[in-house]
């Protein structure tokens, strides 16, 4: 196993933030010890952003030989069209630090997020997911879809 993707909710409650970051740190470090070198993020707000930051942080602070790859659903302008100024700046900083960027398409379509998720699963040997049972749907459909695709791919 050498590659992992991330998926999860866009909204993370503040009380969960510290514990989630700590768990993410130990999860990524554990995966690196098992041979994972490539981490794939979908570039969405919330968990994707947190994961991208953590990969970059661990690469720099702990001198880990790991790579961050972004798989984006559409062009930067389309994806960030309704984002706040601060969210856009954070996104562009992550893009500048990423090792590679792949675009599913140039324009936003009704299926581009699902196509992005399918591509993430296709590229990864394993998927790390953040699931909040009080929020069982995401902007891209049922969370179970990505879980199901990951399970099917692993068999």
What are these regions (language model features)?
Residues 132-139:
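Glycine-rich, Arg-bearing micro-motifs that act as flexible, cationic patches
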Residues 1-92, 114:
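Glycine-rich beta-alpha loop segments
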Residues 111-113, 120:
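Structural beta-alpha unit
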Residues 146-153:
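Conserved small/polar residues in nucleotide/adenosyl-binding loops
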Residues 124:
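An anion/phosphate-binding loop that grips the pyrophosphate of nucleotide cofactors and donors
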Residues 115, 142:
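C-terminal binding/interaction regions
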């Amino acid at each position: 196993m050498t590659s992992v993707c991330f998926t999860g909710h866009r909204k993370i409650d503040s009380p969960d933030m510290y514990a989630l970051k700590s768990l993410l740190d130990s999860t990524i470090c554990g995966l690196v010890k098992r041979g994972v070198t490539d981490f794939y993020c979908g570039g969405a707000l919330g968990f994707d952003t947190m994961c991208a930051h953590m990969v970059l942080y661990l690469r720099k602070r702990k001198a880990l030989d790991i790579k961050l790859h972004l798989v984006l659903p559409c062009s930067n302008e389309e994806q960030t069209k309704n984002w706040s100024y601060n969210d856009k700046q954070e996104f562009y900083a992550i893009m500048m630090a990423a090792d590679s960027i792949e675009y599913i398409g140039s324009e936003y379509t009704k299926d581009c997020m699902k196509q992005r998720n399918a591509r993430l699963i296709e590229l990864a040997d394993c998927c790390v997911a953040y699931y909040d049972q009080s929020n069982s749907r995401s902007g891209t459909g049922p969370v179970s879809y990505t879980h199901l695709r990951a399970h099917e791919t692993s068999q």
